[in-house]
Amino acid sequence: MLNLPHSPAADRNKQPILDALTRILDERGTALEIASGTGQHAAWFAAAMPSWTWQPTDADARSLPAIASRVEQAALPNLRPPLLLDVMAPQWPSQGPAFAQEDKEEEKFDAIYCANMLHIAPWPTCAALMAGAARHLRAGTGVLITYGPYFEDEAQHGPTAPSNLAFNEDLRARDPAWGIRRLDDVVAEARRVGLALRERHAMPANNLLLVFGFS
């Protein structure tokens, strides 16, 4: 077995996320994963949901060989080779043919999935993710699913977990452009491109899984 890059966090959260996905998603479809990282989620979800075709991507070209090796190791017909995709680029994917032309509905995605990206990327990445999702999701029925920590209205959801406050401080120290995002701000960016927050799922370790759909 190949010695592939491994994320302990991805191992911990892959099953709770899968449990949520199986409740949220339709029986079959095609999913685009943004910021696949090690590819652990892509391989796990594709194996558990054989009726869903999974397209992993990453903005870092250095990550693609390891993801490709994981795809090859999984040997699943519904798990595609990874593509280079930077959400800030005007074209998705960043190299090769564009995914979908505006008039080709059959080339759109039924789901776009993005885990643990928004807090380790500059804030404009959020707007770019929302705009790209609006372009590439199947009109009317497609959903954008994001996962990670968010700051919420404490009057509605209670005090912020100390672990999230400490994590945010650590992120800011590593890069001032990083940090846990306010959920209200993320929802506002979605609204600008015609997407609305449909579902909010509380997840382990003070994370949230959010589902956005066309408004």
Per-region residue spans from a language model:
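A conserved beta-strand element that flanks and buttresses the S-adenosyl-L-methionine
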Residues: 113
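Class I SAM-dependent methyltransferase Rossmann-like catalytic core
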Residues: 1-28
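Conserved beta-strand signature within the Rossmann-like core of class I S-adenosyl-L-methionine
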Residues: 140-150
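A short, conserved alpha-helix within the catalytic core of class I
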Residues: 120-133
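Short alpha-helix
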Residues: 177-194
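Conserved Class I S-adenosyl-L-methionine
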Residues: 159-181
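Class I SAM-dependent methyltransferase SAM/SAH-binding core
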Residues: 32, 40-92
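Core SAM-dependent methyltransferase catalytic element
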Residues: 195-215
